[in-house]
Amino acid sequence: MHNYKKISILLILSTLILSACAFPNKEKTENQVPAKDQLSMVQTAVDEYKKASGGLLPIKDRDDSYSIYLKHPVDFNKLKPKFLSQLPGNSFENGGIYQYVIMDVDKDPKVHLIDLRTSEVLKDIRIRIDASGKPLQLGKKVAPNVYEIEYKKYGFKKQPTVPSPYSNERLPVYMNGGNDFVIDYRLDLAKAIKKEKSLPKPGQDIRYLLYKDSPILPAYSPEFTINSKNEPVFKSKVKKY
């Protein structure tokens, strides 16, 4: 009986140790919250770097295959230590869950965030699809160049979703004809539209509504617009993701 208790205690301790190891630095509270002070700190550093370098920005070079939201990640190596004493706690480079990126690089460079938890979910979905050994099959057409995933063929119990960075919603994951994942932000866009006093025009890309009051960008999203009923819809011609 004494030995049984010792074994039980050892098992409990082992479980606790493994649990602690399973949550790296990115699980710390300061590494998860898109804190305004951290964002402001990086924005100030970017502005100072731009001024000191004659208009250049501290960004990593990426080609046109990347979407506008993922194309210009902040290069912290260019900011430390002269313009930034320490990396923000919630940055990917410091074990956090956010990728710092810059938007509107030509006119008014602003620092924003990409929630990398979304990327992790998409990576897991890709691994499961590839591991199935079955050729990719697109399901029901949702919009031009946007299709459901034939999830049952790849071992999923239901249509894949990702947690929204803007709400408590679960957002559907689809694919385009180029074998890329796209995320359907219409649930969040519908809420954003209701808050607007001046509605956008049909045909206008309305994704900006999502980061109008949030530092987080809608990564992996096709373009969305508004229809005659003021509902968010996929744009008829999808080009960049």
Model-identified regions with their sequence ranges:
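Juxtamembrane membrane-water interface segments immediately C-terminal to a transmembrane helix
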Residues: 29-36, 40
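Extracellular/periplasmic head regions of type IV pilus-like filament subunits
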Residues: 59-121, 132, 140-241
